[in-house]
Amino acid sequence: MTNKALIPSQNSRLPAKPRPRAKGFVELLGRSNFSFLQGASSPEEMVSQAVEFGYDGMALCDLNGLYGVVRGFQTIQSPSLFTASPQVKENFHYLIGSELTLTDESSVVLIPMNKQGYSHLCEILTLGKRQAAKGFSKLSLEQIEKYNQGLLCLALPPWTDERYEKLEKIFDNRLYLPLWRDLTWESQEFCRQGFALEEKYKAQLFVTQRPFMHSPERKPLFDVLTCTLHHTTLAEAKNKLIQNSERCLKSLEDISWLWQDRLDLVEKTVEISARVTFSLNEIRYRYPASSLPSGMTPTEYMRHLTLKGAESRYPEGIPDKALKQIEHELELIKDLQYEDYFLTLKEICDFASERKILYQGRGSAANSVVCFCLGLTAIDPVKMDLLFERFLSRERREPPDIDIDFEHSRREEVIQHIYEKYNERHAAMVCTVIRYRSRMAIRETAKVFGMPLAKINAMIKFMGRDGMKRLLDPAVAADFGMEPGPWKMFMALAQQLHGFPRHLGIHTGGFLITQDPITEMVPVEKATMNGRYVIQWNKDDVDFLRLMKIDVLSLGMLTCLRKCFDLLRDVKGRDYSLATLPADDKPTYDMICRAETVGVFQIESRAQMNTLPRMQPRNFYDLVIEIALIRPGPLQGGMVHPFLKLRQNPPKEIKYAHPALEPILKKTMGIPIFQEQVMKMVVAVADFTPGEADELRRVMSSAWKRKATMGGIEQRLRTGFARHGISSEYADQIFKTIEGFANYGFPESHSASFALLTYASCYLKCHYPDVFACGLLNSQPMGFYAPRTIIAEAQRNGVVVAPLDVQKSDYDYTIEKTAAGDLLRVGLRSIYGIPEVLIRRIEDSRKEEGLYIDLADFIRRTQLPRSVLLKLAAAGAFESFNSNVRELIWNLESLSLDQQSFLWGHPKEQFELGEDDDEPEHLPFESNWDRLRREYDSKGYSVESHPMSVLRTYLHSKSEALREKRFVPYFSSEDLKRMKTKTKVRVAGLVAITQRPPTAKGMCFITLEDEFGFVNIVIHPEIYQKDRTTIYTRSLLEIHGQVEKVGAITNIRAERILPLG
């Protein structure tokens, strides 16, 4: 019997008599926030709520994709999920699917029954994405028909006889029609249609809640999402919003009461679910088969390449220890069947080598001697006694992860090679999920509330860099035209929106490369960048399913070093590479100890430069420690300052809690700095295996991400420590150290890989400062410092920097040979706003036809538009034609289009610029300050003088006036070297760096630059809060404060921050 009336809501008064209860229920139409603005709960929330309600299962079916299915699957794998409630059933059935919007505006949900159906669903979703613009899908029923095998079809209403017959012809008994009751006339009409089809065709019906959220409390957020989707406000949305909060997950009791007239349709969901056997566990990944020499297996070829590489790496003979480790690693790689993975990476790196693209592997891969012998990494892990299990072990239960950095200016060549070799059917990049962050969440929610744009912008500005924190105070509501009540709701919704997915982006370099078509494993769609395709899963999804990805990353310093090596060979006649630079160079380490490291790799930050004089690195391993030391792990573990104290005042003897710890900690003076040390410690004194130790590292990382404790692991560690006679006091210290390493402890192998590049960049800066500056400037953007700081630093190191000149400057910065010696010539690339193709026109014409006769000849030959000519003039590029830049700009401003066209069309015609009757006889030359401003506006710096050298006269006169009034005068960075601690000073300079690291407890650090060097400013939280607008909006600052000295380091503790001028 059919009851077609609407049933009361779950929130209505329910009858006192016993309610009928269905024997089971599976929600088959779950939707999450990975439907992008059309779902108000995360996959984790949807699945967890279904489990809590005691459902037999749930299908996660987001719009046109499988974006969130792995997250839901991961939630189901959590053992703690099934202990939350006695109602929970451990045989909870997690299904996946997708809701597809078709070209006839109808919708169907497809759920794979088996592996074939899953592959078909991936193909269908990929086809729909490729036929539409990014963010949309375009599919016809005829296209779906081709892939219908293995798929259940849940056809969403409205239905007609014609539509039902068409779908039944395709899907036969795999076609089902969903019904729901949400207190709307629309759902009542759908029920009427469904019951009619059941009566006429024996259509298979089932019950769903058609949930867009896990709880009715998310209805306001769903309204915000809907308004954002339709670009409207809550006041204007009208019927675009759902009418009530019924479209959420409900308890089985409430579902049973809603459908007490048709409990069979509730229980039908369990029957439908039973037809589905597919699980994401069935996805089997096969790495592409490598091209092998005739008659060789992957295992044999891997061994051949490794031993051949070992002979090259160890020219005096392979050490027994290295050979034993090679055999151990090759055996494990064979057992885990990872040969093709390594061989694929070897092929990619060989391609880079052939193209002379500098690359280097890093991360845990540097713990592997096989990677070292294959040329994937540059660190000898046997010599450095690195722990292989940090990279690969049987206990890890996950594929190896090899990160390879390529030159950032040439990585695209490597990416295109991968696409060309494997094609888009077998290679795609891993996606990143772009989420709503604080500012965007506030902006979008404010738009939905109808706030004026001016107030929204004011609100964003008021937030500053503290996120939503400052807006949580109800007292600020009036400032933005709202009452405290609505403001509280507004902020609550913005906070809920924070972290929601917005759209997909491209991972920095993660590639999934497969033997089988990738679209049988995961849907693929267009990326924003032309010619790029991304899978619908991010790196965490890929890692959880244990799929192998390769990371083709980029590093600016590799670009810089390659360009430096080219310059050394072409200009200086020195043929160097990373492998042939002189090691243990004393002048290089002297420079490092003085913290003269602007522009070099990894040790150029403010914190590193403050540490170097205390650390006094004198060899390569010291650099390895230095790089790892200034990281959140050692800082949070309280290891940095104790280590530096030991470093400055080494004790006669270091006491270890256990003799087994001495070989592990001796190199770092008894204090653990690296992840590998922590792993070795638990192996030595807590009876962990190396593989279990790596699992500990993973647990630490997971605990840190969840801000959780490590529970049972702690007890096992303490038991092991006690067994080895380690006191509880020292056990507490070790455990605190381990917790400090959670997620942020730095791998020794990673630090060693970086240290190679650090030493190379320092050596070049020390011995060839002109070449290093040139390579660094030609590799921008990269690093901490702007070109102006790099140029000023080079000049302080004795480099002669020649200004822009269209007669001599190329696109890039160049080393120019002169009778007086080599000089660094500024490149035309330094000018703001001129495309490279136009700059190349200047360079090419000069090389083909010789130097330009005059400005008219330049205009005639290059045919550049007036806007570009004016930018060249403002940057000083025409001063070889006329040193009076004001006159040049006047002449170019007065150049009419007719005159310019005349020049372009008459290559031999002589034509004088500046014949305008309004031109004055002579324009006065600029003042030094005007010249500086012009050059800074056009390219960000001047090679002639530093702004502070021009302002110094003004500051000196002001200082004299201040002294007469007994106020604190201004001092330069040079003056500060002679100042005593607690001396009151005023300093001024250009802002070089502003940093506010999360480990600094609200402190802010600024590096000011003047004509003599740098001034370190320390800003405490209360001063930062008071003056932060000035800090972030002004490039020239005046600081009032007092001197603080720590060894050779001089800081100014700020008391007041003002704009200079």
Curated annotation (Swiss-Prot):
SMART domains xref list: POLIIIAc
Any one GO molecular function term: DNA-directed DNA polymerase activity
GO biological process: one example: SOS response
Subcellular location: Cytoplasm
Protein family (similarity comment): Belongs to the DNA polymerase type-C family. DnaE2 subfamily.
Protein role: DNA polymerase involved in damage-induced mutagenesis and translesion synthesis (TLS). It is not the major replicative DNA polymerase.
Name recorded for this polypeptide: Error-prone DNA polymerase
Species assigned in the record: Bdellovibrio bacteriovorus (strain ATCC 15356 / DSM 50701 / NCIMB 9529 / HD100)
